[in-house]
Amino acid sequence: MHHHIIQSRSFHSSACGTRAVTPAVRTLQVVAACALLVVAGTSAFAQDPTRAPQATPPTGRGGTQGPQFVSPEVSTDQHISFRIFAPQAQAVRLMASDIPGNAQNNQLTKAENGVWELTIGPIDPGAYRYNFNVDGVATIDPRNPAISESNNNVWSLVNVPGSDLFDTKDVPHGAVAAVTYKSTALDRFRRMHVYTPPGYEAGRERYPVFYLLHGAGDNDDAWTSVGCAGFILDNLIAAKKARPMIVVMPAGHTSRGPNSPIGRTAAEEFVKDFVTDVMPYIEKHYRVLTDRANTAIAGLSMGGGQTLNVAFPHLDRFAYIGVYSSGLLGAFPNAAPAGRGGAPAATPPPNPPPTAAEWEQANAASLDNAALKKGLKLLWFSTGTDDRLIETTRATVELFKKHGFAPVFVESPGGHTWINWRNYLSEFAPQLFQTTKAGTQN
């Protein structure tokens, strides 16, 4: 039993360009918008944040309410103006930790017409999440239809154009599907996003498959919203820098409960769901090549740890492995600061992840198998030098070298941010499947 929604990215504005709104996303938008109506007293719907201001803003159910304005507004000199109508509010802050320069908790200024405003910049080209905090209540921007889900929240998105990686270009575009499937491993329905390359719907060709995993703070929406994965692939494929491929972005969290996302139970549940349900679903419902040479996996932060936990017990199925801002999470107690995504805290959490020695022992059959090593075409790591997990990555790379692997390790500038993760995807994807022919299996 499955529910499969194919989405053309030509309907609704997004920070990375255009994408459709899924039923799940639409529900989240409605909930967030209703919260804002209570705070701001307006029901005006959003305008495209990448366009110039319109003469007359759209009307809500009660007609045009409040002053006419646009938010966010990106100027040609790469400044961003954020605005919100909240005439009764005492304080409004911008929550946008992803924006360089730390825009977290920036105070907006209130005008006589009840519109609060803040301009920041110049900001480097990119897609950025933000919310408003209105008298202690977090809310999305009601004038902006572009949103991005996280694991426990919904964010507004703003795009500062000028990125060669993911700006919308006049090239053939693929499609993104939101797919709901029944997980037999977890006995519940789950969702994943699937990118298919330009021409997939009209053709019969089979494609390589790339499984791309998100981090602890996100869900399966993240790579296609703030991560801009579809547009990055569109542009790489159009430039003949990457092979056309199907990209599968599953949900990384198996529970919203208290379990650590890198703890043993959560890790085991994810691997079981991935191998038992996600991969078989994709191989049944999509025209993918299923041999090892045409299968890749990568992930960021928590997803990087999950990548290693999936790939090495099943190394006969993956020829390309990518780890972004991550490693064997929690395996090296002195390698990273305590906290989510880092090493265990001073008081170990319940159900801690395996130590490095335990992980090596559990995966000895793959780590010391010469034939499996030979079939692994790429083991690729990249982490920013300011990233809190840089020492975890370095220790993980050394572990694989000790077992005779030849990992590629790129230390980039920057930290634990989407700015880096989009770059890592754009560097990793062109290295995939270049030795295999389209539509064939080795």
Where are the regions a protein language model picked out?
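N-terminal secretory signal peptides that target proteins for export/translocation
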Residues: 1-26
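N-terminal export/targeting leaders of redox proteins
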Residues: 4, 43-45
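N-terminal start and proteolytic maturation junction detector
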Residues: 12, 36, 57-58
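Bacterial N-terminal signal peptides
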Residues: 27-43
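Non-catalytic cap/lid and distal C-terminal segments of serine-dependent acyl enzymes
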Residues: 47-64, 68-105, 110-442
